[in-house]
Design a protein with these regions (language model features):
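Membrane-embedded transmembrane alpha-helical bundles that form the catalytic cores
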Residues: 1-463
Length: 464
């Protein structure tokens, strides 16, 4: 079930909210957990077993570490092996068999394994909890209900952000519910829904038009690349906004996942602003334990390439994702070793540097396969014998110009700053007190109309 769907918005969420706020505080976690299990099992109930198994082993090994501290390293290894084996089988077994068959020429069976929704997210949450217990960062949770609620909580279950146990442990035990928090959460949710439905979905239509085009051109390929970058951003950040907003309504404060990444002047800065919870997870649980940057240059390079290769692989079991991660590894290493300091000289230089790199990266990320990625990236820079523009490219540029401009502005802090300036004046604050609720209602109505119409409603990170 997607947040941006009629069943969720009108059949699931309203009764869950009503039941949750009617429930006494001591039973709120149980209500939230049961609601989350219904949410997760809505489409494929059998996948509940995978998630419940992940929760059970995380809880068991956390308790075993507490009871037998001498053997906690063994328990950590066993827990990690179980978690990663389940993820590896479900998500990567088919990919590795295909790769092995291609390399060796062997006729290996083609595995068709259904991927449990959100397994990459909840696996990382369980792993981080067990590692933190091992390190002594957090005490083991003795209440299975609280740990299960942390892992299975539907606002962040299928698409993050990757919430660490320490981030919300106090709120699992006791949290405050206020009208202010609920209103702020609802506002954040509706804005995220608008980003997802009215911008990301519309941009996906432009991307689909390019992929089906019989008149490709350099201009059309650049339109596609820009649409890719903006669509993935509004798709995922919109979903993250909805998750953070829902968490706020239920009394939780989830970490932010995006901070205007397209304003970045380097790849290093970009990954401090893009999918922050994933980047910080790999930093704290893979990169630093490997030695981070406090080691020899060759070891540091190995660490960087390993972490970024895994980051790419986390996003999908395909070589374009692996190369996408390694592409950022090369850039990250080059910035640190050679030209990173030079980028700081002028703001214009930094953004001119990032523009083609982001275009290449998002085309590679979204490509159906490596040959398609190669053709599209070559077309960006005028290779392949394509014309500079064509009838189709000019038609789609005119047709989607308004959405592209709105998306480009929405990817900057300008709208938020404008609203804040209004809020800082008495007259502006009075206007916003009326205009903001009306605008949110109209935005929700527009999103609902789009969804009722049966328009295309994809979500890329749903597959992770």
């Amino acid at each position: 079930m997607l947040f941006s769907s009629i069943p969720f918005l009108f059949y699931f969420l309203p009764p869950v909210l009503l039941l949750y706020f009617l429930t006494p505080d001591r039973w709120k976690n149980l209500t939230l957990l049961l609601s989350s299990l219904v949410f997760y099992g809505w489409g494929e109930p059998r996948f509940l077993l995978f998630m419940l198994a992940a929760i059970a082993q995380g809880y068991a090994f956390g308790r075993l570490m507490e009871r037998y501290p001498r053997h906690k390293r063994l328990f950590l290894i066993l827990s990690a092996v179980l978690s990663l084996s389940l993820l590896g089988y479900c998500k990567y077994a088919g990919f590795f068999l295909r790769t092995l068959g291609a390399l060796t020429g062997l006729s290996l069976p083609a595995l068709q394994i259904a991927l449990p929704i959100g397994i990459s997210f909840y696996t990382f949450q369980v792993l981080s909890y067990v590692v933190d217990v091992y390190r002594g960062t957090v005490p083991p949770q003795r209440d299975l209900l609280q740990l299960a609620t942390y892992v299975a909580m539907f606002p962040q279950l299928i698409a993050g952000p990757i919430v660490r146990y320490a981030d919300i442990a106090p709120e699992l035990t006791r949290r405050h519910h206020t009208l202010t928090d609920a209103a702020a959460g609802a506002r954040r949710f509706v804005v995220g829904l608008g980003k997802k439905v009215l911008i990301a979905n519309v941009l996906y239509e432009l991307m689909s038009a390019f992929l089906q085009s019989t008149q490709p051109s350099v201009l059309f390929t650049w339109l596609y690349a820009v649409a890719c970058a903006l669509q993935i951003y509004f798709d995922f950040s919109g979903y993250s906004d909805m998750a953070v907003g829902l968490g706020r309504i239920f009394g939780f404060h989830f970490p932010e996942n995006f901070r205007y990444p397209f304003l970045s002047g380097s790849v290093t800065e970009f990954w401090r602003r893009w999918h922050i919870s994933l980047g910080s997870w790999f930093r704290d649980y893979v990169y630093i334990p490997l030695g981070g940057s406090r080691c020899s240059r060759s070891r540091w390079l190995l660490n960087v390439f390993l972490v970024w290769g895994l980051t790419g692989l986390w996003h999908g079991a395909a070589w374009n994702f692996v190369l996408w991660g390694l592409f950022f590894a090369v850039l990250r290493a080059a910035e640190k070793l050679w030209y990173g300091h030079g980028l700081e000289k002028t703001r214009l230089l930094k953004h001119l540097y990032m523009l083609p790199l982001l275009a290449v990266s998002f085309v590679l990320f979204h490509a159906a396969d490596l040959p398609a990625a190669g053709q599209q990236i070559a077309a960006l820079f005028g290779f392949g014998g394509l014309p500079a523009s064509g009838v189709e490219s000019l038609y789609y540029l005119r047709s989607y110009a308004v959405v592209l401009v709105i998306a480009l502005l929405g990817a900057t802090p300008l709208p938020a700053k404008a609203v804040q300036r209004l809020r800082n004046t008495s007259a502006g604050s009075a206007v916003l007190s009326v205009a903001e609720p009306v605008a949110l209602v109209l935005l929700l109505a527009a999103c609902t109309a789009y969804l009722v119409d049966g328009s295309f409603n994809p979500f890329l990170y749903f597959r992770f």
